[in-house]
C-alpha cells in the first residue's frame, strides 16, 4: 500500500504538533496548562487549566491523518483518479491548522494575555486559500468535494459548482487573513471564522441547485 507524499507531510506535521506538546509538558511550571472551559453536570460553567489537554490536539491530528490516509482505501473508495491534489491539500491543511492551534494554546499557557484567535483565524484563512485553489480541479466523485444531489447527478454541475465554490473559498480566506490582522476581539474572530468557512459552502450548494435548474 503506497503512502502519498501528502500523507508523509501530514505525518511530519503531526510529529511537530506532538513535539510542541511534549516541550510544553516538560517546560510549563507546576499548576500551569491549557485553559479549559466546560459546562458541568451541575449546570454551571467551569474554568481552569489542564496539563493533560496538551495532548488532545496531537491525538486529533494523528486520528485525522490516519483516517484520511487509510479510510478511503479500506472502504474501496479511491480518490487518486478524481481529486488527488485536493485530497492531499485537505490533509496537509487540516494538520497544519491543528499544529498552529496547538502552538497558540501553548503560548497562551505561558502568557495568559496571548490572543489565541488571531493566529488561528489567519491559519484558517490560509487553509481556505489552499483548499479553494484546488477545489475546482476535483472531478465528480463520492468521496471528496461539495456533494449535493445536483452535483452528484450531473458532472457539468459538479465542475461549475466546484470552480465557483473554490473562488468563494479563496475570497473567504483572504478576508479571514485580513480580519485576523485587524481584529483583536476573540468573539468577533470566532464569528468571522465560522462565517468565512460556512458561507462559501452554502453559496456553492445554492449555486449547484441554480445550475441544475438551468439545464
Task: Locate predicted features.
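Select subsegments of transmembrane alpha-helices in polytopic membrane proteins
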Residues: 6-12, 54-62, 68, 87-96, ...
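Hydrophobic core of alpha-helical transmembrane segments in multi-pass integral membrane proteins
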Residues: 11-25, 58-70, 99-102, 127-129, ...
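Alpha-helical transmembrane segments
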Residues: 13-14, 47-63, 114-131
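Membrane-water interface of transmembrane alpha-helices
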Residues: 24-30, 63-75, 130-146, 206-211
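Active-site and channel-lining beta-strand-loop segments
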Residues: 24-55, 144-153
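Ordered, amphipathic secondary-structure segments that act as subunit-interaction surfaces
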Residues: 69-116
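Membrane-proximal helix-loop-helix units in multi-pass membrane proteins
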Residues: 105-151, 155
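Terminal transmembrane helical module of multi-pass membrane proteins
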Residues: 141-213
Amino acid at each position: 500500500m503506497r503512502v502519498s507524499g501528502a500523507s508523509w507531510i501530514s505525518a511530519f506535521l503531526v510529529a511537530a504538533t506532538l513535539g510542541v506538546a511534549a516541550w510544553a509538558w516538560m517546560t510549563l511550571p507546576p499548576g500551569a496548562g491549557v485553559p479549559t472551559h466546560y459546562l458541568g453536570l451541575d449546570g454551571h460553567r467551569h474554568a481552569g487549566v489542564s496539563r493533560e489537554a496538551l495532548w488532545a490536539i496531537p491525538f486529533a491530528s494523528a486520528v485525522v491523518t490516519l483516517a484520511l490516509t487509510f479510510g478511503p482505501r479500506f472502504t474501496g473508495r479511491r480518490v487518486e483518479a478524481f481529486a488527488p491534489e485536493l485530497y492531499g491539500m485537505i490533509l496537509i491543511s487540516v494538520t497544519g491548522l491543528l499544529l498552529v492551534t496547538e502552538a497558540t494554546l501553548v503560548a497562551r499557557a505561558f502568557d495568559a494575555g496571548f490572543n489565541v484567535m488571531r493566529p488561528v483565524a489567519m491559519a484558517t484563512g490560509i487553509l481556505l486559500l489552499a483548499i479553494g485553489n484546488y477545489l475546482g480541479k476535483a472531478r465528480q466523485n463520492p468521496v471528496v468535494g461539495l456533494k449535493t444531489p445536483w452535483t452528484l447527478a450531473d458532472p457539468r454541475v459538479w465542475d461549475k459548482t466546484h470552480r465557483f465554490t473554490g473562488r468563494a473559498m479563496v475570497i473567504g480566506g483572504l478576508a479571514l487573513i485580513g480580519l485576523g490582522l485587524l481584529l483583536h476581539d476573540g468573539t468577533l474572530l470566532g464569528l468571522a471564522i465560522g462565517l468565512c468557512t460556512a458561507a462559501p459552502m452554502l453559496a456553492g450548494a445554492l449555486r449547484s441547485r441554480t445550475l441544475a435548474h438551468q439545464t
